[in-house]
Amino acid sequence: MNFEKALSFVFGSEGGYSNHPNDRGGATNMGITAGTLARAYKQGIVKHQNIKALTRAEAAEIYRVLYWRPSKADKMPEPLCTLHFDTAVNHGLGGAAKLMQKTINNYAAKAGLKLSVAVDGELGPKSMAALDACIKYRHNLHLICEIYINEREKYFRAIVAANPSQACFLKGWLNRIAKNRRLLS
């Protein structure tokens, strides 16, 4: 199943407990924020709200229920599903959807496809149909993935440009981008 591969990829990038003062997400464990853990608790996915006590199995279930399925990564081919899932974990569902929509529009323009989607942060039926059309056109999934990774790198750099306090995270973010690129090779 693609989820297990994608989960392993994400766990390879996400560390244990962290509470960096500049991290806008606050305290995290294995990439799960305290806010996401509270949401998972309210939905009955986990039985506690202690971010430090989060287990790998609990994190995996949170990722499956709150990120994998809602991001629609489960509807994408490999390796795009892994890249998109990793992005959803790192940027949230809406952020990942916007990057995918920008990718669709960028790829369509490069390929000469006459389609575009709204960059609204919602991967609805129109966006998913456009993604499917892009994937089927010339079967160039590798290029779609490259564009997606490039859009993600631009996003990281824009975060730092807009808020220099986030520069302390740029090296780690770019390491994650490099890991995304290695997935394609």
Annotated model-derived regions:
Residues M1-S185:
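Cell-wall polysaccharide-cleaving catalytic domain and substrate-binding groove, primarily
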